[in-house]
Amino acid sequence: MDGTRTSLDIEEYSDTEVQKNQVLTLEEWQDKWVNGKTAFHQEQGHQLLKKHLDTFLKGKSGLRVFFPLCGKAVEMKWFADRGHSVVGVEISELGIREFFTEQNLSYSEEPITEIPGTKVFKSSSGNISLYCCSIFDLPRTNIGKFDMIWDRGALVAINPGDRKCYADTMLSLLGKKFQYLLCVLSYDPTKHPGPPFYVPHAEIERLFGKICNIRCLEKVDAFEERHKSWGIDCLFEKLYLLTEK
């Protein structure tokens, strides 16, 4: 392992305010799906999660797992296939339908009575439910508490000005002895406006530190050729485990 590229103590960028006023609307996110601008989707699933999954699950079954801003993440099926109950929220109906189609899962849809004009999509097996609505409306549905949250591509996509509201929503969904798995990206925010946005360690502490123990499990070089178009020359991904204090 190259200690200068994957160690957990790489210096973070000091200009953390440069992206604070960046805003993407829900309509702009929906347009990304319509126009196929979904390079954030990982067809093979997230490799850090795959690496640590069995350690996190510890042989348990029947856990409730929440996927914020789930898109069509294949990891949802990983958990469902291991006997867990998966709930996701995604603003794009297209993304949700693509998930069920690509995973060859039959499903039904029904209105979310608490949020007029929205739907929930449920697998025929009953262990995957995907809510098509804003994540900030989700608490109105009384979906209950979760044992685990897999947050990859969610906190980094939320408008920086909405992070406190987002974090409070996530914390309100956590049950006892929870595991909150969080992936964030580290790059020079003066070179790329986001999303995905740069989320430094201090921001995670600010958002979750009063309630959670915070541990960075791994930091890996995530730079790909496509990231050159962002104007950056390095990109790291960090996997955090947040647990109950």
UniProtKB/Swiss-Prot annotation:
It catalyses: S-adenosyl-L-methionine + a thiopurine = S-adenosyl-L-homocysteine + a thiopurine S-methylether. It is an enzyme of class 2 (transferase). The modification N6-acetyllysine is found at K58. GO terms for cellular component: cytoplasm. Its EC number is 2.1.1.67. Keywords: Acetylation, Cytoplasm, Methyltransferase, Phosphoprotein, S-adenosyl-L-methionine, Transferase. Pfam families: TPMT. The modification Phosphoserine is found at S14. S-adenosyl-L-methionine binds at residues 29-40, 69, 90, 134-135, 152. One of its GO terms (biological process) is methylation. Substrate binds at F40. GO terms for molecular function: S-adenosyl-L-methionine binding; thiopurine S-methyltransferase activity. Gene3D superfamilies: Vaccinia Virus protein VP39. InterPro entries: SAM-dependent_MTases_sf (IPR029063), Thiopurine_S-MeTrfase (IPR025835), TPMT (IPR008854). It is found in: Cytoplasm. Belongs to the class I-like SAM-binding methyltransferase superfamily. TPMT family. Monomer. This is Thiopurine S-methyltransferase. The lineage of its organism: Eukaryota, Metazoa, Chordata, Craniata, Vertebrata.
